[in-house]
Amino acid sequence: MELPANVQNQLMQFQQLQQQLQMIMYQKQQFETQLKEMEKAIEEMEKSGSDEVFKMAGGILIKRNKAEVKEELSEKVETLQVRVTTFEKQEEKMQKRYTELQESLQKVMGQGQ
């Protein structure tokens, strides 16, 4: 049975949306992982009694002022939080569109039988 052109188009949109949604979820997960790592680094630095910490730079460790490194990490945390929030909003919109398209396709496919 040949599917009508509009249904084929919807199926193609559905598959593309599914791929985009998976990519958004993957990217969001990557940023969430980085965010947790940064937060853990800040937490560990706060436990340290020293005013200096070592920071990895290009494969070597460099002694740095703890307050400066903490400020850098805090800025990175803020940036990552914004990115995660952005990806969450995108994911939510795409998930809604995905569900709508899925329901529409189920309806059309159900009528064709």
Swiss-Prot record:
Primary subcellular site in the record, as a coarse category: cytoplasm
GO cellular component terms, semicolon-separated: cytoplasm; prefoldin complex
Localization per record: Cytoplasm
Record carries keyword Cytoplasm: yes
GO molecular function: unfolded protein binding
Domain of life according to the entry: Archaea
CDD domains membership: Prefoldin_beta_GimC
Keywords recorded for this protein, A-Z: Chaperone, Cytoplasm
GO biological process, one term: protein folding
Pfam families named in the record: Prefoldin_2
Family, similarity comment: Belongs to the prefoldin subunit beta family.
Complexes and interactors: Heterohexamer of two alpha and four beta subunits.
Chain's role: Molecular chaperone capable of stabilizing a range of proteins. Seems to fulfill an ATP-independent, HSP70-like function in archaeal de novo protein folding.
Name under which the protein is recorded: Prefoldin subunit beta
Source organism of this protein record: Methanococcus maripaludis (strain C5 / ATCC BAA-1333)
Lineage summary: Archaea, Methanobacteriati, Methanobacteriota, Methanomada group, Methanococci
